[in-house]
């Protein structure tokens, strides 16, 4: 139903579907992976009572910035996507959208996100420039370093810091525990994602943690996920979170254990499904935080 609704927008403009695909609106998994930790941080910053305006600002902000990030990512990869099986049908790779149009879409989406940030406060506005810089540089990192997933983690975690400044006007040191936890988690699940393209990436010279980790990939991913949960436990203690939060962490831990088992043969599609599965871990933690505050 969701895809049918998106495709119906072609009635408004014959190329609407091409731009929606460029913004990856047909694949909302990236929205979920960015949204859950952002909302977790917002709920904690607001002690379980975030304003509706902040919830809307950060929810729509996540959608816009993730879409913009996809546009600039495809711009950066436009010359290599056609050589990778999973990406050879992307709009830039097939010529349905031009490089100039992709840059314009990136600018429009980031501009719209910035208008939302202007509804917060000066500190959050200044922080938003860091988010823009990370979003713009991440797609190019895979040409120069084996750690592009770390840059993605930094970008995907930036909204956590912004929720605290938007809510309270300041950034407590403990918020960095949530930031580090999400960065570690992101590196883990995006390594699963990179494992789906590892053979193609080796041929075309694209770098990733999946290539760097080699045969230790799954063990390192599980270690990163465990460290992420450890940081969340520490943050939970600092923010006085209790049983429901810990239950959410337990469900997330079960998700991580299942992913480790499921990818034991490193099948490409299984690695991709493990990447998608991380959405449920993030949702479990968010629900745990919401219930922990709501049922006090």
Swiss-Prot record:
Its recorded reaction(s) are: all-trans-octaprenyl diphosphate + 4-hydroxybenzoate = 4-hydroxy-3-(all-trans-octaprenyl)benzoate + diphosphate
Q: Where are the transmembrane segments?
A: 28-48, 52-72, 102-122, 146-166, 169-189, 219-239, 241-261, 275-295
Query: Where, subcellularly, is it found?
Result: Cell inner membrane
State the disulfide connectivity: none
Query: How would you classify this enzyme at the top EC level?
Result: transferase
> EC number(s) of the enzyme?
2.5.1.39
Query: Record's GO cellular component, any one?
Result: plasma membrane
Annotated membrane topology is: Multi-pass membrane protein
Q: What is the stated purpose of this protein?
A: Catalyzes the prenylation of para-hydroxybenzoate (PHB) with an all-trans polyprenyl group. Mediates the second step in the final reaction sequence of ubiquinone-8 (UQ-8) biosynthesis, which is the condensation of the polyisoprenoid side chain with PHB, generating the first membrane-bound Q intermediate 3-octaprenyl-4-hydroxybenzoate.
NCBIfam families, A to Z? ubiA_proteo
Would you tell me the protein name for this molecule?
Answer: 4-hydroxybenzoate octaprenyltransferase
Please name the gene that encodes this protein: ubiA
């Amino acid at each position: 139903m969701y895809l049918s609704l998106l495709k119906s927008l072609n009635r408004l403009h014959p190329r609407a579907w091409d731009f929606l695909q460029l913004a990856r609106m047909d694949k909302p998994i990236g929205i979920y992976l960015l949204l859950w930790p952002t909302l977790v941080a917002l709920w904690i910053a607001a002690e379980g009572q975030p304003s509706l305006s902040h919830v809307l600002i950060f929810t729509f902000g996540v959608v816009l910035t993730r879409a913009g990030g996809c546009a600039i990512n495809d711009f950066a990869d436009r010359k290599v996507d056609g050589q990778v099986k999973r990406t050879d049908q992307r709009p830039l790779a097939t010529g349905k959208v031009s490089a100039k149009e992709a840059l314009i879409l990136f600018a429009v989406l980031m501009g719209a996100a910035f208008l939302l940030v202007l509804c917060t406060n000066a500190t959050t506005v200044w922080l938003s420039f860091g988010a823009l810089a990370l979003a713009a540089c991440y797609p190019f990192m895979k040409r120069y370093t084996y750690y592009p997933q770390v840059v993605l983690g930094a970008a995907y975690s930036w909204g956590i810091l912004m929720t605290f400044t938007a809510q309270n006007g300041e950034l407590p040191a403990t918020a960095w525990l949530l930031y580090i936890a999400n960065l570690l988690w992101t590196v883990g699940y995006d390594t699963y994602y990179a494992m789906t393209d590892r053979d193609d990436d080796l041929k075309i010279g694209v770098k990733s943690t999946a290539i760097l980790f080699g045969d230790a990939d799954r063990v390192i991913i599980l270690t990163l996920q465990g460290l992420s949960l450890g940081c969340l436990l520490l943050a939970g203690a600092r923010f006085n979170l209790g049983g429901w939060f810990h239950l959410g962490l337990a469900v997330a831990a079960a998700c991580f254990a299942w992913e480790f088992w499921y990818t034991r043969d490193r099948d490409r599609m299984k690695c991709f499904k493990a990447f998608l599965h991380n959405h449920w871990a993030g949702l479990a933690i968010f629900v745990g935080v919401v219930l922990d505050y709501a049922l006090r």
